[in-house]
Amino acid sequence: MVRIMLLAEKIVCLSHYLESGLYERQQTIRLCLLAALCGESVFLLGPPGIAKSLIARRLKFAFRDARAFEYLMTRFSTPEEIFGPLSIQALKEEGRYQRLTNGYLPETEIVFLDEIWKAGPAILNTLLTAINERKFRNGDTEDKIPMRLLITASNELPEADNSLEALYDRMLIRIWLDKIQEKKNFRALLSSHKNENDNPVPANIQITSEEFHQWQKEIDKIVLPDSCFDIIYHLRQQLDATEHSPYVSDRRWKKAIHLLQASAFFNGRKEISPLDLILLKDCLWHDLHSFKLLPQYLNTLMTEQAYRQRILSQQIDSLYHQWTQACQDKNDQQALKLEKQTRLFGRKIQYSLPDHINEEKLILFLHTPLHLHDIKVNFIELEKKALNIWINKGRELSARLNGIGFPQNIAAEVNSAHQPEIFDISRRSSTLYLPDHQHQQNEENNEWQERLEKFNQEIHHQHQLFNQHQPCLFIESHWLATIEQSFIQLSDKIKQLKIKIGS
């Protein structure tokens, strides 16, 4: 585990060196680095002059002794310009069709192809084989290609053309770039005099070929937990059910999972976490519509499902409804109920206290605490005589609030269930009950608090998992802040319910 954590620290350090001097390209560098570390491809979409080629050159320095190839495609580009010219000598002397590949795509680790959609069919077909199989057929031999990262770029998306669609599907990570937005970054760009093509990475940080190949074996061992698979499957169902949603091939899903495995590995984890799934927003979009749609779907999944937030919220709501109903039932059972008196000719309903109330001084608790005369009142203390006067004459009830001070008048009525009900100034009401039931109510409240505490512990456990899945180098910080806010909302819900139950 220590070795894995040291690796994570090395990758963080490497990324910081690669990002230096590039403004508002931090996330792009990190995603391209992740793609390079697991042998995937990247498509950069954006206008000219926004450092697309510089990003590709920077990634070369992530690897020790890596070779790079870059080329600007035109409608007239030929395979010779990408894969190397034909050997005249081999053709003349041996009759062999062989290319001289030194310095061209078949012999380089980092490849950048700009204006990729202008490539002709001959280039596209050979390029597809190179991406899929990492092999290049040169005459009568088939050579392995050392390519670790292919970055393609364009200022437009491919047209609806089958010949281009196949290549577009091979570009696993798709990044939509724009010019620098922040004033301070624009100022820093204009003021910088550094040579952007210099190597910013110390040799001891660069990745060796031995390390790269060993890591590929380790990446494949990273586990996809059932909980993360369920989220992925839910996202897949959402996309399938959405009108005009992007078509995502099984191959792309498979390669996306490999990218998530790499993310987990280089963040020092042995299994994919929900945070890694955020990377799917850069893998599954196809056009402007899906580019905007995927972050919305993933935001919902991260704040509701990733750490059981929605289930916990629903369970807390259910507990609140159960408690409310239990309180209502208990209040109806415990509430002081007057006895209805029947008179032969009287039209007005008359009431009296139950016979079992013999005390001259009474303490009556409120089922729902009210603010009366600027005091939060939990119980009232009054003379039995005063209560009888109110029952018979229907005037305001006179009682000491919380048993303190002089008696004060309280608005009160007898409700349809024949129960005395008192009101505050905003007409919020509460029925009353005798102290015999107070001990029972405290015990019941403790039971509800204990049930609530179990939810609190589960929230704490899920929050601990969230913290354990960090830091996550390849995920932007605003995603982490959004997930953190979902835990704050759950905790606030628990606190509010605790106050209600304890009041």
From Swiss-Prot:
One cellular-component annotation, GO: cytoplasm
Residues holding ADP: 23, 49-54, 196
Principal location class: cytoplasm
UniProt keyword annotation of ATP-binding present: yes
Activation/inhibition comment: ATPase activity is stimulated by ViaA.
Top-level class of the enzyme under EC nomenclature: hydrolase
Keyword Hydrolase: yes
Known EC number: 3.6.1.-
Catalytically driven reaction(s): ATP + H2O = ADP + phosphate + H(+)
Localization per Swiss-Prot or TrEMBL: Cytoplasm
Keywords: ATP-binding, Chaperone, Cytoplasm, Hydrolase, Nucleotide-binding
Description of how the protein assembles with itself and partners: Homohexamer. Interacts with ViaA.
Family, per entry: Belongs to the RavA family.
PANTHER family per record: ATPASE RAVA
Name the UniProt record assigns to this protein: Regulatory ATPase RavA
Organism: Photorhabdus laumondii subsp. laumondii (strain DSM 15139 / CIP 105565 / TT01)
